[in-house]
């Protein structure tokens, strides 16, 4: 009975969000993880049911590997996002196991967006591109909360907050001067300032961001 229920739920999801799923597939998203994330987003941990994101941290940095899945509007868009400095080189993340003890790695699994403290928001409010001199003002950030037993540690590390935020090392200027590469964060998910507010504002508070290594189950890296 449980297997039948899961199958029926998957069929309903596929038909209800056909456009978003087709977009995700075309854009190179890991589809097993996308489907897993959609199921997870229905849990009581997430108040936002109309939008979620999947970050395939295993793809090269030069790929648009952060997939914003808008279920309300039945579409998916793909964006650049940086990984943590302990995940690997600027070109590609290659280390995923050990994230629970290395805080400079992006935590894997289901994360929930939440309101960031004023000091955090202020820190990333204005970003300047060190290559082009372009300045972005009025940028927003969201705190990230771990909702699984293996990533809830990020909720209680003294003096450390995990955030989804903008930074210049994901910008078009950086990408032009460093082909195929992005800068690296201190364990946060970092976005291109040009599209940061579109993503952060759409996710709001209470949305799922699922950080995955391709289609692999997260348990493989615990």
Task: Name each region found by the language model.
Residues 3-12:
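Sec-dependent N-terminal signal peptides
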